[in-house]
């Protein structure tokens, strides 16, 4: 299949990478796994045995007319422990290579189908100026976009850093979450070739 390239000849790409059916279940699973992996998992609460104090019985067992109590750190008491206290845990989920590649191909194919993938011959700015990048995006009529280049472009990355809903990355920096987070994805022709090799 062929992808239209702005300002250059059409680019021939593999149908298995840019023309496959959308596997919603797989994409969902991989995106959820990425979100889970981003969780810190450091939340910690104290159980009744961990809360400081509560060693002495507050009052005697019988004869006071009050409900019996053995410790002031019981979960039903104010300042007591938490019944099912949250503990630090690892939320990460396993995503094997085949699943990851399948999800990436599904997302890229869907971007092509929805005409959200824009391929350009070259995309760069002369200086790390946000103003320059804004002008370039205006030419393409874009306000919400991920720009993917074949290699690290310091000027472009710095220019994009201060823009809302605009991000710039090299091929090594893209993942399923970044591809679906933006309205449009702008890729250089060289980046498309690299993505194809990476997912082959």
Curated annotation (Swiss-Prot):
Keywords attached to this entry:
Ribonucleoprotein, Ribosomal protein, RNA-binding, rRNA-binding
* The keyword rRNA-binding belongs to this UniProt entry's keyword annotation: yes
Q: Which domain of life is it from?
A: Bacteria
> What's one GO MF term for it?
structural constituent of ribosome
Q: Where is this region: Disordered?
A: 42-65
Cysteine pairs bridged by disulfides in the record: none
Purpose = One of the primary rRNA binding proteins, this protein initially binds near the 5'-end of the 23S rRNA. It is important during the early stages of 50S assembly. It makes multiple contacts with different domains of the 23S rRNA in the assembled 50S subunit and ribosome.
The record's similarity note reads: Belongs to the universal ribosomal protein uL4 family.
Name-wise, this protein is: Large ribosomal subunit protein uL4
Species of origin: Vibrio parahaemolyticus serotype O3:K6 (strain RIMD 2210633)
